[in-house]
Amino acid sequence: MKKTFFYLFAIFCCFAMCLVSCEKPQTGGGGEDDELEDVVLPEGTIRLQALTSQYGSGPDMGYSNASHNFLLMFATEDCEVIEGEPFGNGDILVFELFSESAENILPAEGIYPIKDMEPIEDGMIVGGFDVEMGTPFGSYIQHMENDEFVGWDLVTGGAMEIKKTKKDGVLEFYIYTINEDGTEGYYYYRGKLLIENLSAIE
């Protein structure tokens, strides 16, 4: 009887921990329930639709030690990459990010604000938000300092530089952001493209 109770209690605890670890940060402007087909985006836009919950252990629900950290983006027109097939209009891109790669960095040579939309050395900008659009197209991105999670930044604008490496579909890209408080940010990510078009697996 005691063993049965212990097993049931252990199962309950595991279930409760799973529920907690799957909790998501709230996205700006209505979040990921927005009807994509009803959203009119400017030509050349990449939409950062959502940053999903982090699954892992550690401080702050594992945000700084995430083992599975996904970034979901929505391409609104054909977008080229340096290597590999271009992203097509309407493609939904799912990246698995390397947890150690999420960095908030200072403006660097070769990275340009969205208003300039100039090419980036060794890469190319494939899209961006109109910074005047504001929070309806906002999303939360984790803010890392010295490899530690310090909070969520609400991103209301962004540009993206992306390049595909030759090995295993690993991508490196920068995201230029206009944060909720009006400050600018540059985020560097490394990750693996898992799905190029969600509709292809329906």
Ranges and model annotations:
Residues F15-Q49, N197-E202:
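Bacterial Sec-dependent N-terminal signal peptides
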Residues L41, L97, T156-M160, Y174-E202:
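Edge beta-strand at a domain terminus
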Residues M1-S21:
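Sec-dependent bacterial lipoprotein signal peptides
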Residues H68-L71, K167-Y174:
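Short, hydrophobic/aromatic-rich segments at coil-to-beta transitions
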Residues L36-N65, G158-K166:
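Short, exposed beta-strand/loop patches in secreted or surface proteins that constitute
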Residues M61-K163:
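Surface-exposed helix/loop patches within compact recognition domains
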Residues E32-L36, E43, P59, S67, ...:
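Intrinsic-disorder/low-complexity loop/linker signature
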Residues T52, S99-S101, K166, T177-N179:
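A mature extracytoplasmic/lumenal domain signature
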